[in-house]
């Protein structure tokens, strides 16, 4: 890539970034936070943050990248996707009906709400405990990160339950919503994330998500400003780089450290070159249709329930890694949201996928607003916990693709819903046994004397 080609790409990148950032800023000024703001920032991070890092790698370290015309296609496809997404998100098919009393789908009381977060926390802690008993601290046992996906590690399915610690702590926060509860959420979830980082052998997802939710709650409540958010973002990038060095066992300094920082940061936060790599191999893709969405559910079905379950799950990430790139290193390469749509149906699926994603984010915002208007604080805490807990699934949506998102959000919905049902069942049993007593608020002595 020469300077003229880079200049052309830079113009497209600047215009695309300005387009998305401007729309996001207007939305932020209007509502301060909703899931459209979050997804827009996540989209910017995934598809545009990596371009400056790639440019430095090319001109400073002479790293090979996809041809400029392919990089241009990647930038334009991302900008067009966001345009279709935004129009879909903002389009209202029916008039908004205000102040209509509807029968609630469910209600929550104090005991049921506390039982729910205890059950969610129990699911996470028991899963971590069983995994630890089988494998110990994998971070200190394994020699390479890819080994955590090998047969040496048992109970891999348990890792899917670790994340439910975060929704549990979200319920605790939303019941109080003060600065102490906010800081407690950060300390508890990051500590749990560091524990799972050592046990699993280098998975940083729980730490990133806990920190991101902490920051967005701070923005919503006005406890942190935009410059503090930017400073925290820089701190987060440095922290993730340090954890990545520990995960891969790297000891670098000087130019090598700078080079390592650039490519690890790009791969961690902005795998946009994976989309370019996919577009470069467009002619090698045998479009999979909706099959990757169905196949991604296979990992949630235990072998004792389905003895003939395929050992290899050919979702869009694995198809891209194994079939398109012929890479069998043991690690799946993230195709990104747009890449997963290309694997499923080519360029035609990009605008269709943008429409689907727009409707998904619209639904999460509807649920979030429902929680904001809910007079029952216990039910509001559950609704908000579900919405913010699904942030992990939105990160999966942007990085891994639509197929991975669908399976994980269904799994999250099933476990979260089952926890609610169990909490309600336990409350009914305790109430039937006479163990539940209504709280009585005692009047101050002065009021008692007046009444007498």
From Swiss-Prot:
Protein name according to UniProt = Probable ECA polymerase
* Alphabetical GO biological process terms: enterobacterial common antigen biosynthetic process
The metabolic or biological pathway listed in the UniProt record of this protein is: Bacterial outer membrane biogenesis; enterobacterial common antigen biosynthesis
Q: Of which family is this protein a member?
A: Belongs to the WzyE family.
An example of a Gene Ontology cellular component annotation for this protein is: plasma membrane
Extract the signal peptide range.
none
HAMAP family registered for this protein in UniProt: WzyE (MF_01003)
């Amino acid at each position: 890539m020469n300077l003229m080609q880079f200049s052309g790409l830079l113009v497209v990148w600047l215009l695309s970034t300005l387009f998305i950032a401007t729309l996001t800023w207007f939305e932020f000024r209007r509502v301060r936070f909703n899931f459209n703001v979050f997804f827009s920032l996540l989209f910017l991070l995934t598809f545009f943050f990596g371009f400056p890092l790639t440019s430095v790698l090319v001109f400073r370290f002479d790293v090979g990248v996809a041809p400029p015309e392919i990089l241009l296609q990647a930038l334009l496809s991302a900008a067009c996707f966001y345009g279709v997404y935004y129009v879909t998100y903002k389009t209202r098919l029916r008039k908004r009906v205000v102040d209509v009393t509807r029968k609630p789908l469910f209600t929550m009381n104090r005991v049921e709400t506390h039982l729910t977060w205890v059950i969610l926390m129990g699911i996470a802690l028991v899963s971590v405990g069983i995994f630890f008993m089988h494998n110990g601290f994998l971070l200190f046992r394994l020699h390479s990160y890819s080994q955590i996906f090998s047969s040496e590690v048992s109970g891999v399915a348990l890792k899917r339950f670790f994340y439910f610690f975060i929704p549990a702590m979200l319920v605790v926060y939303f019941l109080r919503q003060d600065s102490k509860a906010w800081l407690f959420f950060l300390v508890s979830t990051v500590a749990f994330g560091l524990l799972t980082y050592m046990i699993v052998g280098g998975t940083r997802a729980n730490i990133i998500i806990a920190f991101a939710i902490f920051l967005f709650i701070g923005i919503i409540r006005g406890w942190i400003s935009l410059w503090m958010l930017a400073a925290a973002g820089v701190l987060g990038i440095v922290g993730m780089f340090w954890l990545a060095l520990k995960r891969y066992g790297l000891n670098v300094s000087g130019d090598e450290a700078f080079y390592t920082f650039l490519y690890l940061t790009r791969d961690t936060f902005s795998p946009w070159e994976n989309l370019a790599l996919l577009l470069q191999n467009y002619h090698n893709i045998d479009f999979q249709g909706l099959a990757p969405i169905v196949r991604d559910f296979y990992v949630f079905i235990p072998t004792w329930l389905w003895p003939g379950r395929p050992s290899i799950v050919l979702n869009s990430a694995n198809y891209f890694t194994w079939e398109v790139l012929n890479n069998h290193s043991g690690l799946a390469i993230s195709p990104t949201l747009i890449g997963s749509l290309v694997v499923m149906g080519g360029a035609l699926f990009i605008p269709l996928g943008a429409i689907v994603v727009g409707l998904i984010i619209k639904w999460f915002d509807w649920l979030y607003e429902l929680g904001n208007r809910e007079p029952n604080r216990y039910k509001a805490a559950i609704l908000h916990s579900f919405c913010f807990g699904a942030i992990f699934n939105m990160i999966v949506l942007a990085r891994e693709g639509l197929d991975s998102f669908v399976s994980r959000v269904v799994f999250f919905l099933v476990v979260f819903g089952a926890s609610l049902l169990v909490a309600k069942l336990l409350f009914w049993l305790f109430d039937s046994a006479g163990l539940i007593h209504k709280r009585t608020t005692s009047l101050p002595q002065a009021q008692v004397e007046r009444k007498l």
